[in-house]
């Protein structure tokens, strides 16, 4: 329970919405094992683990190409690629590896389109904490209204502790949360990772310095 309390501090979401994992990658694979989606929409390029996890459960993978002439940003034509036979849409905000963010209005339109098509939207926000306007960009406030939304978060990026492995996801759908928990080992987060996460949340001055440095060097 302590690890969930830690994630509550980070996300301001109810404890019953939170599932902790051995890093965000652990939760990505759990998601695909739990959902077993037949048709998945990913962006290209994107973090390779999305495609690998989808392939393990036999999903048909379709790609939305991020184009140089669009500064590698998602455009409104993605809405046409989300169809009633789409089971899962996986996006990364900001995208890995391009570093680009989707306009907030378009992101909420994608979320609504997914609901219309009974599709799950998985939003990887693991790099969002680097942004100065992260509070305006996150879709965490939409979780209560959209049970078809899952948000991934991790401590390992901003706090430079990737080897410790600590991540979590948030979802308001109780059944989906139970399926996620059942799709992985029950003791996936070590005591060391829990303690590191608690310590990280007290290091706000460090986090602010990292954000400032990243902004200066972009």
Give the location of each predicted region.
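Short, small-residue-biased leader/transition segments that mark boundaries at the very start
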Residues: 3-8
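Short acidic capping loops at alpha-helix termini that bridge into adjacent secondary structure
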Residues: 14-18, 39, 125, 147-148
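Conserved beta-loop-alpha segment that forms the PLP phosphate-binding cup at the N-terminus of a helix
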Residues: 15-38, 167
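PLP-dependent aminotransferase-like
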Residues: 26, 33-91
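Hydrophobic residues in well-ordered beta-strands that form the structural core
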Residues: 42, 63, 123, 151-153, ...
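Helix C-cap/helix->beta junction micro-motif
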Residues: 57, 116-117, 146
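Active-site phosphate-binding strand-loop segment of PLP-dependent enzymes
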Residues: 69-131
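PLP-dependent aminotransferase class I/II
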Residues: 148-218
């Amino acid at each position: 329970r302590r690890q969930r309390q830690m994630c509550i501090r980070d996300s301001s979401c109810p404890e019953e919405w939170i599932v902790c994992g051995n890093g965000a990658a652990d939760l990505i694979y759990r998601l695909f094992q739990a959902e077993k989606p037949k048709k998945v929409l990913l962006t290209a390029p994107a973090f390779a683990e999305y495609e690998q996890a989808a392939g393990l459960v036999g999903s048909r993978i379709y790609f939305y190409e991020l184009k140089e002439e669009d500064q590698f940003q998602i455009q409104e034509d993605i809405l046409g690629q989300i169809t009633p036979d789409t089971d899962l849409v996986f996006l990364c905000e900001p995208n890995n590896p391009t570093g680009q963010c989707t306009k907030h209005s378009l992101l909420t339109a994608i979320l609504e389109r997914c609901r219309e098509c009974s599709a799950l939207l998985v939003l990887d926000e693991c790099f969002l904490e680097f942004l100065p306007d992260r509070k305006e960009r996150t879709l965490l406030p939409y979780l209560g209204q959209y049970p078809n939304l899952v948000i991934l978060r991790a401590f390992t990026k901003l706090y430079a502790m990737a080897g410790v492995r600590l991540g979590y996801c948030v979802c308001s759908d109780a059944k989906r949360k139970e399926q996620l928990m059942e799709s992985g080992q029950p003791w996936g987060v070590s005591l060391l990772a829990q303690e590191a996460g608690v310590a990280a949340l007290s290091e706000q001055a460090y986090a602010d310095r990292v954000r400032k440095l990243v902004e200066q060097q972009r």
